[in-house]
């Protein structure tokens, strides 16, 4: 047995091969800045290959130890393992591990190091003494490799050594656990971080009223203790990820110039070299016309079922006017068709489970994304399909949950989940089949396994902002131009492909500032970003992606002999902000079609929402922008009041059990049955499409105040029980709000006869 004991600070990176995994295996242990490190197997031409997984969990190891076995059937000794680590914070670097073989192998393997991936230095040789015998090794690297920001290591056959085995080309060389260690020691260059870029740009007049200031530096940074930014008189808390610092802000005013400031010395590198100049950025949120206030047209379940809501929207006479459907928290099932059927793969007829939207301008608004779950009813009949068990209505256009037809343009979804009823691994279980144009999804979730979302209009434009798209196989696929802004892509299980774009309108699938996560850790290093569904037309571009679960090193996959117009990335990073190595990304599709998998900075910057979707002035980001949060919220007994806002369509008033009611006035009387002094109540503002934003809370007062005998009210205002102001002298049950000279207000509920 061979045992190594290290302090956590010694590790640069390591693979113990305990958990399953082969082909572009992420490091099992790593130091800061090495969370993007992978171990790969290459052939003599540098192409990536897989290996036989001999991990402890997958195979019980190889001859008593976990490892990775080559097991290729051609080119004995032509394949080699390689990795690249960031050793910029380490000196006295060493690599240790073990190797063995079975069946056939060269008996000596060299361990080599390189600073550029071209010129290699042999640091030691592993001479294996017979089949099925582990040989341990430890090699110290020369000082020239100290503090190397890019240090490559490879394990390659010494073809001058003897071979052992049956004489065939089947290679049984096995790599055991690897530990790359060093002595932590940063190199202090004495230079402060340099600000390379920032958002919004200086002088920008198109910023959001709620967003974030983004500062990008030339090296990894940290904030000085207590350092904060300042904007509109408010202190902004920083968030640091690698080389980037962000400052979230909210509730700015449209069309008003602001200046963000950050004092000198607030940002420093990891050796405490601090910036010497203050940062100042002037920008102006875009202008926006005031919006008309209106209540929801249909509330589910208050006004009826989900089927009733869709029927009402479809039956309205004026389809140019937006119809807003609101769903309280709950689970809802679209009804089966009463007169249409679909033929299952078993040849039988089943009631059509798909709901069809044929009219434009409908908003589907939920109380909360997790709280509102909408699905359909599919038969629970499973057959043996081409790729395993499959629902009889699997397939595009058969068991879809929701289908937007060509005329259903301008539909809007927010704060809800559309979910497949088929279950995982039951074939193509489409949640949204979109044949329309200008659909917007904001902070919503599409939940399925394969072909979750199908953009089905070559001339269509579609926009996603925030929210979750979940699946395993081609779970965003199809035609047209789709802009995914800050969406969380959730990868299910092992393997799979996120996207399968086909024919674009012009720009294809653009993923900007998105995040990729695994439903479990099994996804890490085992999926790809997409594959081309077509010949020479598919486009998928990932820009500024945070890959909490990393794809395979090659990044992309083949599909039915197709090839892309472009499948590429820019600035893909790990959760810690470590840049992901894109040099191994797939460059050839269908054997002969070249692909440049890396975007330039200028290319990436061009793909804005405006450039991709705004040819006719369509601005989905402004449409989806959340209404300003409520300000001035106060409680006067049963009555809540707050500042009016002309960019809010309505307000939702919330109690401890959810939404109590809605209003288009900046006040609301809580019904007696829902009121309790001391409880917390909240108000949420809706944007022009009806989507609700964050809740602002207040603690309710009793409404009974002591008033001294010599105090006189300077103002008295009367309201009815609906919170609408009425004239003095009105009859009925009224709310009297008195304001006194000292600023106090007293609210009294009274009966006026």
Protein language model regions, located:
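C-terminal outer-membrane/trafficking sorting elements
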Residues: 655, 701-753
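Terminal, low-complexity interaction segments
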Residues: 120, 124-186, 265
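Acidic, Ser/Thr/Gly/Pro-rich low-complexity segments and short DxT(G/T)-type signature motifs
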Residues: 188-201, 253-254, 264-289
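Sequence-level preference for short, compositionally simple segments enriched
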Residues: 289-639, 646-652, 658-698
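Extended, low-complexity, turn-rich repeat/linker tracts enriched in Gly/Pro/Ser/Thr and Asp/Glu
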Residues: 89-91, 100-107
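Extended extracellular/luminal ectodomain segments enriched in beta-structured repeat modules
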Residues: 87-96, 148
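Short, surface-exposed alpha-helix to beta-strand junction/turn motifs within ectodomains of secreted
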Residues: 209-240, 268
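Surface-exposed, low-complexity/disordered Ser/Thr/Gly/Pro/Asn-rich loops and linkers
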Residues: 37-89
């Amino acid at each position: 047995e061979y045992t190594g004991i290290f302090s956590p600070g010694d590790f640069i990176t390591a693979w113990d091969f305990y958990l399953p995994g082969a082909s572009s295996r992420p490091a099992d242990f790593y130091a800061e800045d090495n969370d993007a490190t992978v171990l790969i197997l290459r052939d003599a031409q540098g192409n990536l290959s897989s290996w036989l997984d001999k991990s402890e969990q997958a195979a019980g190891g190889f001859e008593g130890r976990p490892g990775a076995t080559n097991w290729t059937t051609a080119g004995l000794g032509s394949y080699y393992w390689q990795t690249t680590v960031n050793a910029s914070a380490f000196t006295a670097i060493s690599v240790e591990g073990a190797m063995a073989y079975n069946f056939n192998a060269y008996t000596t393997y060299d361990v080599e190091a390189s600073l550029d991936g071209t010129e290699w230095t042999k640091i030691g040789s592993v001479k294996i003494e017979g089949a099925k015998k582990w040989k341990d090794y430890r090699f110290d690297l020369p000082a020239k490799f100290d503090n190397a920001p890019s240090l490559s290591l490879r394990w390659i056959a010494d073809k001058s050594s003897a071979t052992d085995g049956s004489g065939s080309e089947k290679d049984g060389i096995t790599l055991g656990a690897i530990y790359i260690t060093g002595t932590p020691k940063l190199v202090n260059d004495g230079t402060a971080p340099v600000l390379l870029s920032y958002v919004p740009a200086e002088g920008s007049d198109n910023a959001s009223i709620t967003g974030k200031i983004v500062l990008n530096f030339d090296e990894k940074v940290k904030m000085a203790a207590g350092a904060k930014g300042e904007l509109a008189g408010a202190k902004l808390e920083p968030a640091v990820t690698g080389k980037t610092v962000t400052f979230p802000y909210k509730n700015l005013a449209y069309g008003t110039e602001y200046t963000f400031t950050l004092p000198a010395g607030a940002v420093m590198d990891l050796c405490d070299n601090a910036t010497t100049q203050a940062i100042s950025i002037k920008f102006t949120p875009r202008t926006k016309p005031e919006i008309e206030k209106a209540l929801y047209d249909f509330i589910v379940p208050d006004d009826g079922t989900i089927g009733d809501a869709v029927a009402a929207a479809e039956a309205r006479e004026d389809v140019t006017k937006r119809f807003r459907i609101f769903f309280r928290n709950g689970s809802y099932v679209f009804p089966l068709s009463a007169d249409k059927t679909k033929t299952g793969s078993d040849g039988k007829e089943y009631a059509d489970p798909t709901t069809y939207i044929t009219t434009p301008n409908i908003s589907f608004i939920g109380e909360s994304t997790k709280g509102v779950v909408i699905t359909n009813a599919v038969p629970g009949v499973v057959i043996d399909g081409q790729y395993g068990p499959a629902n009889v209505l699997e397939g595009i256009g058969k068991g879809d949950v929701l289908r937007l037809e060509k005329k259903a343009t301008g539909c809007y979804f927010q704060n809800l989940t559309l979910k497949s009823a088929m279950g995982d691994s039951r074939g193509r279980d489409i949640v949204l089949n979109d044949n329309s144009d200008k659909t917007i999804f904001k902070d919503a979730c599409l939940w399925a396994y394969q072909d979750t979302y199908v953009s089905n209009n070559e001339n269509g434009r579609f926009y996603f902002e925030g929210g979750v798209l979940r699946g395993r196989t081609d779970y965003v696929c199809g035609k047209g131009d789709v802009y995914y802004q800050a969406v969380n892509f959730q990868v299910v299980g092992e393997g799979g492909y996120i996207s399968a774009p086909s024919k674009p309108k012009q720009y294809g699938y653009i993923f900007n500032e998105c995040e990729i996560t695994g439903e479990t850790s099994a996804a890490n290093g085992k999926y790809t970003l997409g594959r081309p569904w077509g010949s020479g037309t598919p486009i998928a571009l990932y820009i500024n992606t945070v890959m909490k679960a990393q794809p395979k090193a090659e990044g992309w996959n083949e599909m039915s002999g197709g090839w892309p117009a472009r499948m590429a990335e820019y600035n893909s990073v790990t959760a810690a902000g470590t840049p992901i190595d894109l040099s191994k990304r797939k460059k050839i599709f269908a054997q002969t079609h070249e692909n440049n998998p890396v975007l330039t900075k200028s290319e990436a910057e061009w793909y804005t929402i405006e450039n991709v979707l705004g040819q006719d002035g369509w601005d989905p980001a402004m449409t989806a922008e959340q209404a300003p949060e409520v300000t001035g919220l106060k409680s006067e007994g049963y009555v809540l009041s707050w500042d009016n806002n002309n960019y809010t369509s309505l307000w939702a008033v919330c109690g401890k059990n959810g939404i109590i009611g809605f209003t288009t006035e900046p006040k609301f009387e809580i019904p007696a049955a829902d009121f309790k002094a001391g409880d917390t109540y909240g108000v949420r503002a809706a944007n022009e499409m009806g989507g609700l934003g964050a809740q602002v809370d207040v603690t309710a007062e009793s409404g009974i105040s002591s008033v001294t005998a010599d105090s006189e009210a300077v103002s008295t205002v009367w309201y009815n029980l609906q919170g609408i102001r009425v004239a003095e002298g009105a009859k009925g049950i009224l709310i009297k709000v008195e304001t006194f000279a000292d600023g106090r207000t007293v609210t009294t509920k009274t009966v006026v006869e």
